[in-house]
Amino acid sequence: MKHNFDNHTFLASCEHDADKNVMHITFTNGKTYSYGDCSHDDFEAFKNAKSAGKHYAQIKASKGQYQP
């Protein structure tokens, strides 16, 4: 499942891999980072957050970058 952030300063999109419970977040500079232990509920909360930037900071702090 994928979500595009329209007109966001630094977030371009996020995608959730339900099989691996991983969220891939792509930035406007083209780089993609992956975060593990992210449920579908985490994905929904991120895409519907009032402030996607603040929510991203929470994901980054609590999940850590995923290393496949």
Q: Where are these predicted regions, by residue range?
A:
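Acidic/histidine-enriched, beta-strand-rich ligand/metal-binding domains
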Residues: 1-68
